[in-house]
């Protein structure tokens, strides 16, 4: 009988200790969660990145737009509409919209992005810089917007996300995922194949988040202070030519224009082309006109699977002579 009473007493003590321990763990976990929430709040950028990168190995597709990219050109489409249409018409590209984050630099662009139910992030501008209207190639505001873009990607890399950056004037005709070498630190598009050196174009590139790429983007962004009048693309080219990439031990690849083509150098093979970039073009109306023709050519190819030449880029080739062109506000 005493043995039975002793066992019952021990059981009561054990049960009491179990519940006390469980209560302690529960309260401690709540404390930790509260501490994390208090010290490390999830900001709007992190929220947008987390949602866009979900289920995609922390890789997010990023593009940047302003008011000029979401306004109709004449009675036609908008640049953003054409960009999104390419995902709908491309091969294996539609699911990638789930991983696209649109960075809006003004309220009009942000509202349009939200209306289209995309993953949207509004980048706040400071110093009274107006990034709303069309920024013509090599204008002061154009250069400023490119540097803001570089700083944003640096921030994203620091947060541990891999990035596929794409200009909005890039048509996605096939998924690039199978054509990118994910083991490389960075892969970047080129304007044209050139034996004398890589004519890189920062309108489309893939970059992994690691210490080497973060160091590259930090150095790249810091050099803006000593690069007045230069666009960020030229500054990156100087870093490449100076051997800085090699100093960091970066493994870099350059994307062939056969698969990642553009108006500077068309791909001759519609059967393998992945993206088409409206590079070598001065302004938005010309880009919209000629990219509309690109999508028309692509739809014709999908219907017949007969390789043919791309339509001439009439407006873009003539855009450099538009000396009286007034940027769209």
UniProtKB/Swiss-Prot annotation:
Q: Which UniProt keywords apply?
A: Signal
Against InterPro entries, the record matches this protein to: At1g28695/At4g15970-like, Nucl-diP-sugar_transferase
Read off the Pfam families from this record.
Answer: Nucleotid_trans
Query: Which stretch is the leader sequence?
Result: 1-22
The name under which this protein is listed is Uncharacterized protein At1g28695
